Amino acid sequence: GRMADDTVVLTPPARLAQPVDGAIQRRFGEPIAGGGRANGLTFAAEPGARAVSPATGVVQYAGPVKGWGVILILRLAGGYHLVLAGLERTSVQVGQSVAEGQPVGWAPDGRQSAAEIYLEVREQGSPVDPMKWMRKRVG
């Protein structure tokens, strides 16, 4: 049983920084090609752009996942998890602590695959809409 999970008090992130400078191309809940709905946000990125961590956390996974490029999974302080996907490569390792805004990798150069970065936030394993925590970029 998973009864013990019910006693865990989760604290949502106070805010999330955009992983890359770029427009949001797909929002949470929007229909996606092939069926289903988006579980996160997709940002347009400049080819080869540096991607930064949207929040402070600890790297739980860093590596390639078929169809998603290189992904990062962070465990945030409040018990939430954050997934960053679509990276070309990362500059962090499992177990490493990262700060909000810290560079963690690079977007693709755009030749092989679109320079898009995907952001997903999970609450006890279920995707939730990151928009409510997105810090508005000034400018």
Where do the language-model regions lie?
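Well-ordered beta-strand positions in beta-sheet-rich domains
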Residues: G40, I71, H81-V83, E116-Y118
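Short histidine-centered loop motifs in beta-beta connectors
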Residues: A62, A77-S97, G101
